[in-house]
């Protein structure tokens, strides 16, 4: 077997491509490599037997732990359900690819990106997106490509192209920009309250790099002698569109101009027009061309009716500057917000509503042991902030089986999670693991941004000291030729019939998350810049409404939330606290009924529903780790007697021994003649031997229990900051 090897020099790195060797039965395949990261990306097209009204595109990213030299956990020692990370990368591939396939295409297309080797310096997701474009082009599948993606980071004042995992964690920006020759088709970003201008500059910087990769793909096709298959739309039968335009245009326009209609009322009136039109067609003679056409494809009427509705709604926005609910283009829907709506068994709760979109968010405070362990290829081993998004069928007035979360729910939850992370407090000041759940109770557009707003309110109600509140809004776009209209706070019908869904979240200081999806083949940076700038006043307006519900974190936590104490010990003394086989720390937890977590850096977190118990555990640990010095005097309790002396606990968990010769100035025959177990005595540290054992004495020390002794000298450690 022989393949063809090509390479692309990009940003000082070599991207290696191998074609014609792997997966020979796929329409197109490429092994794309950079550093030690290797992915096999395939594109396969099959003819769909059933007629549908959408493009059946499937994009899958799969990762196997052998790519990082690891064996899966669990009894089976085999990968199971795709982890959340794989689902998010699958969406990252799908979102820029989907708008670049022709809208009329109905063949099944599946793109599979398999991570075969992972280098922590080269994240696999960006290679997977670019590889999807290359595989599709090589497979000669109709496609408005090439398309490519890059990641942009920001460290200090410098943008970094395709940063490593460590650089991503270190920087203030993580943005993925995907584009075609026509412009940008997808953006996904998380940022540390970055200004709008800096964000726009990062997008521009990224698209310049995307253009280089697009040119490289065109050169690759020339080198391989492959001619790109440009989509050629089949000739459409105009019979039905002409009939609908003649019979339905005015009735639809009247409905779209009834600004006082609710979503349900508008949908019912449009459905009524469609049903009446269907009745007219059914009354035609059996040999009528239109009736024959619909008998062959019963979905055609709904499809073409939607197209006409879309055309008329867009025309109304372009020409009249009015939306279907009567709002101006930059107007936000009515907002209501409230916090603390559930009993305090739920640690924090809030209800956020914008128009007909309504989200209930709850916050649960957990202990460090509640952190989610990550069993995937991400270098991060655990998550301490979780956001779960649920979209039940009743939220859109439908009935269907309720399953496990799908890709959409996982993606929306991840976006809301990313928007909040930059404002969370450090674990040194607030060591709780946080889980927020957003339940979409009613949906009419922008539920993910409603979840961001609800999350903020819920976290504040739970007493989480956020650095700043976060709000979000979804921006839309109508583009007809050179005419462009940007819409603020889009609702469901505008999302469905528009060209862009651009979600922007942030604080009053700057942006924390972006997500842009297109339905056209690309937008210039200038239009995207305009949308970002117009989102800011909308976000600030929403923030004002949110702060009317709750302005700052609750001063006290729910009485049902665990109490945590966090402090630092010398990392070298961690073993002392844990003890042989974990006996010491187990004894402390059993004695105080607490949960104790110790990190490698020496941060100790104690969890308990009883604050006094947590403080007792802290005293024991501090006693174990406190250094004792010769000459110090302590009150203590005799814990046990042996023939040659007595053991005395001088600090919680720390004992020393008084040799029989040190019990008294006079000769002592039996230890029990002087002290017994449980006696309270005052002792002085005589010496600390080479093995760290503490030797004590009662000689020369008064036993009145009221004498003074030196204040404990704490072990010098770094402060918790």
UniProtKB/Swiss-Prot annotation:
Residues 711-721 have a biased composition (Pro residues). One of its GO terms (cellular component) is cytosol. It is found in: Cytoplasm. InterPro entries: ExoRNase_PH_dom1 (IPR001247), ExoRNase_PH_dom2 (IPR015847), ExoRNase_PH_dom2_sf (IPR036345), KH_dom (IPR004087), KH_dom_type_1 (IPR004088), KH_dom_type_1_sf (IPR036612), NA-bd_OB-fold (IPR012340), PNPase (IPR012162). Residues 562-621 form the KH domain. SUPFAM superfamilies: Eukaryotic type KH-domain (KH-domain type I), Nucleic acid-binding proteins, Ribonuclease PH domain 2-like, Ribosomal protein S5 domain 2-like. Its cofactor is Mg(2+). Belongs to the polyribonucleotide nucleotidyltransferase family. This is Polyribonucleotide nucleotidyltransferase. It comes from Prochlorococcus marinus (strain MIT 9301).
């Amino acid at each position: 077997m022989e393949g063809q090897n090509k390479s692309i020099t990009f940003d000082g790195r070599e991207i290696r491509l191998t074609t014609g060797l792997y997966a020979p039965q796929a329409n197109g395949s490429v092994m794309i490599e950079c550093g030690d990261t290797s992915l096999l990306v395939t594109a396969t097209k099959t003819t769909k037997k059933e007629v549908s009204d959408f493009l059946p595109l499937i994009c899958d990213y799969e990762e196997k732990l052998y790519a990082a030299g690891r064996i899966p956990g669990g009894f089976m020692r085999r990968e199971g359900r795709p982890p959340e990370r794989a689902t998010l990368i699958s969406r990252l591939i799908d979102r820029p690819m989907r708008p670049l396939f022709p809208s009329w295409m109905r063949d099944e297309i599946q793109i599979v990106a398999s991570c075969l080797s992972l280098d922590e310096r080269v994240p696999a997701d960006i290679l997977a997106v670019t590889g999807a474009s290359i595989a599709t082009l090589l497979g000669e599948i109709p496609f408005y490509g090439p398309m490519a993606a890059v990641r942009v980071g920001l460290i200090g004042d410098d943008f970094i192209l395709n940063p490593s995992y460590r650089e991503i964690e270190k920087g203030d920006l993580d943005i993925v920009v995907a584009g075609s020759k026509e412009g940008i088709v997808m953006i996904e970003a998380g940022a540390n309250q970055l200004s709008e201008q800096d964000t726009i500059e990062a997008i521009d910087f990224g698209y310049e790099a995307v253009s280089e990769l697009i040119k490289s793909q065109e050169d690759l096709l020339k080198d391989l002698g492959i001619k790109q298959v440009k989509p050629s739309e089949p000739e459409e039968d105009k019979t039905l569109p002409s009939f609908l335009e003649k019979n339905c245009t005015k009735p639809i326009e009247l409905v779209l101009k009834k600004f006082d209609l609710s979503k349900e009322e508008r949908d019912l009136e449009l459905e009524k027009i469609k049903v009446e039109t269907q009745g007219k067609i059914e009354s035609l003679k059996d040999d009528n061309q239109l009736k024959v056409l619909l008998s062959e494809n019963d979905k055609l009427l709904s499809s073409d009716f939607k197209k006409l509705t879309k055309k008329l709604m867009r025309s109304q926005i372009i020409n009249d500057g009015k939306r279907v609910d009567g709002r101006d283009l930059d107007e936000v829907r009515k907002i209501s917000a409230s916090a603390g709506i559930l009993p305090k068994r739920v640690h924090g709760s809030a209800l956020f509503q914008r128009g007909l979109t309504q989200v209930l968010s709850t916050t649960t405070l957990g202990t460090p042991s509640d952190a989610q362990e990550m069993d995937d290829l991400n270098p991060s081993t655990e998550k301490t902030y979780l956001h779960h998004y649920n979209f039940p069928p009743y939220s859109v007035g439908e009935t269907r089986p309720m399953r496990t979360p799908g890709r959409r729910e996982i993606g929306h939850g991840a976006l809301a999670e990313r928007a909040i992370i930059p404002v969370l407090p450090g674990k040194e000041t607030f060591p709780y693991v946080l889980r927020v759940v957003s339940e979409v109770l009613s949906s009419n557009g922008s539920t993910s941004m409603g979840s961001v707003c609800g999350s903020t309110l819920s976290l504040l109600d739970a007493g989480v000291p956020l650095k700043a509140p976060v709000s979000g809004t979804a921006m839309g776009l109508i583009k007809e030729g050179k005419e462009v209209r940007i819409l603020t706070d889009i609702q469901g019908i505008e999302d469905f019939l528009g060209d862009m869904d651009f979600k922007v979240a942030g604080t009053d200081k700057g942006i924390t998350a972006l997500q842009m999806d297109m339905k056209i083949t690309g937008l210039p940076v200038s239009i995207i810049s305009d949308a970002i700038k117009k989102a800011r006043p909308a976000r600030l307006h929403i923030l004002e409404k949110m702060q009317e519900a709750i302005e700052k974190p609750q001063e006290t936590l729910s009485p049902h939330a665990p109490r945590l104490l966090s402090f630092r010990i010398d990392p070298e003394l961690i073993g002392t606290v844990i003890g042989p086989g974990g006996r010491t720390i187990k004894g402390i937890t059993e004695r105080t009924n607490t949960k104790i977590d110790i990190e490698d850096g020496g941060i100790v977190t104690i969890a308990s529903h009883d604050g006094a118990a947590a403080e007792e555990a802290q005293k024991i640990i501090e006693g174990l780790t406190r250094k004792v010095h010769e000459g110090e005097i302590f009150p203590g309790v005799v814990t046990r007697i042996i023939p040659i002396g007595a053991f005395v606990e001088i600090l919680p968990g720390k004992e020393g021994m008084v040799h029989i010769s040190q019990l008294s100035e006079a000769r002592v025959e039996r230890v029990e003649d002087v002290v017994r177990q449980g006696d309270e005595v005052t002792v002085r540290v005589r010496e600390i031997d080479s093995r760290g054992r503490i030797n004590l004495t009662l000689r020369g020390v008064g036993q009145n229990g009221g004498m003074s002794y030196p204040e404990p000298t704490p072990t010098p450690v770094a402060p918790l900051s």
